């Protein structure tokens, strides 16, 4: 199998993995401050860092959604590299 065919397969798989993760993610970091009793979400809003309070009952889900975003971002970076390689091979 040619290199470009392998890359196209990888591109398709990564696209499917990304699409599967788009339904529930949360951009930012959910953390528990030692000085506070609850969790906070730190994220960027219009270029500024904002800290939002996370209720105790939704903290586990918010943490999971934040982790999901990090995985999603890694997949997007991998897809970008594959797309770059395909672009270079097609232009030869």
Predicted segments, located by residue:
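A positively charged, amphipathic N-terminal helix/segment that binds anionic biomolecules
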Residues: 1-92
């Amino acid at each position: 199998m040619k290199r470009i065919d392998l890359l196209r397969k990888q591109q398709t798989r990564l696209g499917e993995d990304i699409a599967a993760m788009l339904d529930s993610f949360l951009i930012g970091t959910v953390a528990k401050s030692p000085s506070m009793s609850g969790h906070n979400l730190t994220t960027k809003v219009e270029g500024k860092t904002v800290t939002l309070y996370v209720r105790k009952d939704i903290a586990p889900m918010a943490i999971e959604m934040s982790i999901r975003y990090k995985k999603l971002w890694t997949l997007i970076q991998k897809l970008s590299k594959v797309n770059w390689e395909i672009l270079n091979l097609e232009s030869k």
